[in-house]
């Protein structure tokens, strides 16, 4: 189907960031925020050439005059017109390729609604005229990127987290657990607890500043109670951060209280089990014979697993839940922020994968529902 000289494109559409590039590369060429910004006010200056919408980094840099909207909520696309804008921007501005010349591998959230997969397929073939495409589940790609075909992936991005047990390359749908708690909720929580300290962050632009604070200064405590005592009795855990306007803020126990929410969702009023329990529950829904393989291959993936200390804490918490003799191994690859994309890059460049693409011809014969037959 595909000639060897045409490289496939790999696009991982996350709730927070789009990662895009060419199959066979070891990292994405383009990484930009999944946002579309629209001007808050009608332009007054004539001839300024103000656009009616801005995408990605350009929207980010003009955030002072725009209203920013993330169009992928909890991993699921909610606004297809904006999604088309983002894909258009990816092809033409970021990768500078003609979409009709390259097969495209897209990623989707586990348990993505069927209608959504069909819509993605339809847009690729009808709007962008792709010669071929494929839709792969994000967590499965992360597992491939870690060099495994069996394991449980805890994938946590900006909009949603999932625990996905995978056996011999196939996700086990009955055991997948979705947790609507991820990076964006942590950012919102950090905004809230910084307000208690007397700093106010309210606008969409200020939220981006707080996200940066979170990424640079937060970490997961090995023992939360102990860490709280340390923070209360000394200032050794305090760090300062300079805001864009030059004002300096100091942040103390917020540094680990923010990501602790992943383990204690009650912090933000969610009645859900923490990520350690969710992993355990997911494993317990699987056949008793494969649990040992899952415990020993627990792979972290996604930007919200980048907090220092998260792997040690998960190891400790899951060990407390699992049978005492069980060997537990948490794998936290350094490039896990992009492991979904890297897995896609690996998959799309395998010679054995080339017969898996959905071709334009197959799409024309069967319509969008072909995606359920070819991608699973």
Swiss-Prot record:
Subcellular location: Cytoplasm; Cytoplasm, Cytoskeleton
GO MF annotations in UniProt: ATP binding; hydrolase activity
Pfam families reported in the protein's UniProt record: Actin
Its EC number(s): 3.6.4.-
Tissue: Embryo. Predominantly expressed in the aboral ectoderm cells.
Keyword Acetylation found: yes
An example Gene Ontology CC term for this record: cytoskeleton
Keywords: Acetylation, ATP-binding, Cytoplasm, Cytoskeleton, Hydrolase, Nucleotide-binding
Modified residues (N-acetylaspartate): 3
Residues that span the membrane, as ranges: none
Principal location listed in the UniProt entry: cytoplasm
Catalytic activity: ATP + H2O = ADP + phosphate + H(+)
Propiece residues: 1-2
Family stated for the protein in its record: Belongs to the actin family.
Role noted for this protein: Actins are highly conserved proteins that are involved in various types of cell motility and are ubiquitously expressed in all eukaryotic cells.
Name of the featured protein: Actin, cytoskeletal 2
């Amino acid at each position: 189907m595909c000639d060897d000289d045409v490289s496939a494109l790999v696009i991982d559409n996350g709730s927070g960031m789009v990662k895009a590039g060419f199959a066979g590369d070891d990292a994405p060429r383009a990484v930009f925020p999944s946002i579309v910004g629209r001007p808050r006010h009608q332009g007054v200056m004539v001839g300024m050439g103000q656009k009616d919408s801005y995408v990605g980094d350009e929207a980010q840099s003009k955030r002072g005059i725009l209203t920013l909207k993330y169009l992928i909520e909890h991993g699921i696309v909610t606004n297809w017109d904006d999604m088309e804008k983002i894909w258009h921007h990816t092809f033409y501005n970021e990768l500078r390729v003609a979409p009709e010349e390259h097969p495209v591998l897209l990623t989707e959230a586990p348990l993505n609604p069927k209608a959504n997969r069909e819509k993605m397929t339809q847009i690729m073939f009808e709007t962008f005229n792709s010669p071929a495409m494929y839709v792969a589940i994000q967590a499965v790609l992360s597992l491939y990127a870690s060099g495994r075909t069996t394991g449980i992936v805890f994938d946590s991005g900006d909009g949603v987290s999932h625990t996905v047990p995978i056996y011999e390359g196939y996700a086990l749908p009955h055991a997948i657990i979705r947790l609507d708690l991820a990076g964006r909720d942590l950012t919102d929580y950090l905004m809230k607890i910084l307000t208690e300290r007397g700093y106010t962050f309210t606008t969409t632009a200020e939220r981006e500043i707080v996200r940066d604070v979170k990424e640079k200064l937060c970490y997961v405590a090995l023992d939360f109670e102990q860490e709280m005592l340390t923070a209360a009795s000394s200032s050794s855990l305090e760090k300062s951060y300079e805001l864009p306007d030059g004002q300096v803020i100091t942040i103390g126990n917020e540094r680990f209280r923010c990501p602790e929410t992943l383990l204690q969702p009650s912090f933000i009023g969610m009645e859900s089990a923490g990520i350690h329990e969710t992993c355990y529950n997911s494993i317990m829904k699987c056949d008793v014979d494969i649990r040992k393989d899952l415990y020993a291959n627990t792979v972290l993936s996604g930007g919200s697993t980048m907090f220092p200390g998260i792997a040690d804490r998960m190891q400790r918490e899951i060990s407390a839940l699992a049978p005492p003799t069980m060997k537990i191994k948490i794998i936290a690859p350094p490039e896990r922020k992009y492991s979904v994309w890297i897995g896609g890059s690996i998959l799309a460049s395998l010679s054995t994968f080339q017969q898996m693409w959905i071709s334009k011809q197959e799409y024309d014969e069967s319509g969008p529902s072909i995606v359920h037959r070819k991608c699973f």
